[in-house]
Amino acid sequence: TMLDIDFGSYPFVTSSNTICAGACTGLGVAPNKIGEVYGIFKAYCTRVGAGPFPTELFDKTGDQICTLGHEFGSVTGRKRRCGWIDLVALKYAIMVDGVTKLIMMKSDVLDSFETIKACVAYKVNGEEIDYFPYDISEGLEPVYVELPGWETDMTRMQSEDEFPEEFNAYLTFLEE
């Protein structure tokens, strides 16, 4: 969504529509023929190339997420920019795309972290906002909530019953 030519962080966008409605246009499918709209997101954020990225991490945590998540370009091998999840941007994407169901992926990348952060708002010129601003050229300072990590290998789990309490708390927090 953030790379969409009309709704993304212009001018750091691609030349086409990447939102759900763009799929309808590209495929010649009427919007009323779509039932559910699945929003698929990572448990953390990434960005390729230039452009605003309020939650980008420039430290060993960002490097660790990049390494554990195998966040390198498939063609160039270039390292992707990594950061904590940005719930303000996620809510914006949900609204623009008309998402009816969410699917989180790559939560196992966060398995080893003692603490996990989630951006719930931004500070712009000292004022806290909880919506995605039209002009993001000015510095957006992320406002974080810290959550306990689950420090458990999620890749070995066979059912939801095995999920650690901290992981379930993270999911509940994201759902709210």
Predicted regions and their residues:
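Non-transmembrane, aqueous-exposed alpha-helical and coiled segments at domain scale
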Residues: T1-E176
